[in-house]
Every structure is written in C-alpha cells, then in structure tokens.
Design a protein with these regions (language model features):
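Short beta->alpha linker loops
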Residues: 18, 37, 53, 113, ...
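Generic anion/oxyanion-binding catalytic loop in active/binding sites
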Residues: 12, 34, 132, 149, ...
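Solvent-exposed, flexible loop/coil residues
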Residues: 11, 89-90, 158
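Basic/polar phosphate-binding segments, predominantly the helix-turn-helix DNA-binding elements
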Residues: 154-172
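An amphipathic alpha-helical interaction segment
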Residues: 85-154
C-alpha cells in the first residue's frame, strides 16, 4: 500500500503503530518521528524506515510533502529491526516512484519483484546519525519538548532552569 503525504502546516499524529513496516520519504519540509526514547529527524531528500509494530508519532513543524509505502511484516524480508534514516539512491527513488502508482490490491509477479528490490535497498541502506535521545528526567524532558515545539525559543540557561525547577548549574 502506498500514498502521497501532503501536510499543509504544523501537525502531530497520535502515537500509533502499523502491522506493516513503513518506508517514509520526504520531498520537502522536515518531519520528526518520535519512537520510544529517541526522536529521528527526517529532512527533505531522505527516507525513514519504521519497523512493524513500533509505536511512533509523526510531528511536522512546517509544511511537509512526502510519501509512504507499507511493507508486509510476514514477507520474510529480514528488514532492519530498528528505525533508521538514510539517503536513498537512484534505484530506490525510481522503484518507489513506480510503487506509488500501484493500485491498492495484491501485487502481481512484476510488482513483487520490484518490492523485493525496495526491501534490498532498505537492508543495504546506511543509517545516518539523525536520532536524538530524549532525556529521562521529567524536568529535562519538559525543556526538550518545549524546544522541539519551538526551536526558535531564545530563553537563557537561567530562564530554562527557573522554569523547570533545576539550578542553572545543574542544567549547564
């Protein structure tokens, strides 16, 4: 199953999961993927792999234009068990472009072969260091969440410390 994604502005999906793995690509904009204790940034021109059954949320701070393909978990494809962001090569881009035109029905033999190529490209991809660990301390987490919502917030260390109940020395 494939779909185009057009998000006109700020948007956040509720935390959810898919029975299928999700391959998510960005043409324009920036998307943040929250999964567990990590957040991944998906910039334009890159692709995210989200394994099946991984609870996640998608957050867009601006207009986003991209696409999504879903990969059956039972396909025996031995795909990566952890999320990753990577830069697609020309082969993956061409295969995805074709797959996005497929009707929502069972794959024929040629489509199944191309889906296998897409799976090969996911397996062969090199993860990029776009994962951001999230703090476990509730006070630090509130600061990180506020900065994620408004990255242009220019509060000083002292102001953040006062707002979170930490000393500025602890925060620095």
């Amino acid at each position: 199953m494939a779909s185009q994604l057009l998000v006109p502005g700020r948007r956040r999906t509720a935390r959810h999961q898919h029975v299928r793995g999700q391959l998510l690509g960005a043409h324009h904009g920036l998307l943040r993927i929250e999964a567990g204790d990590l957040h991944w940034l998906l910039p334009a021109g890159h692709v995210a792999w989200i394994p099946p059954l991984l609870p996640h949320a998608l957050i867009g701070a601006e207009a986003f234009d991209g696409w999504s393909l879903y990969v059956r978990a039972d396909a025996g494809l031995d795909l990566p068990p952890l999320p990753r962001i990577f830069q697609p090569d020309a082969l993956l881009q061409a295969a995805v472009t074709r797959a996005l035109r497929w009707p929502h029905q069972a794959l024929d033999a040629a489509q199944a072969r191309l889906a296998g190529v897409i799976a090969d490209e996911i397996r062969a991809s090199t993860p990029l260091p776009f994962a951001l660990p999230q703090p476990r301390d509730r006070r630090l987490w509130r600061i990180a969440a506020a900065l994620a919502r408004s990255p242009d917030d220019l509060r000083s260390v002292q102001a953040w410390a006062a707002a979170s109940g930490l000393s500025s020395r602890s925060l620095a």
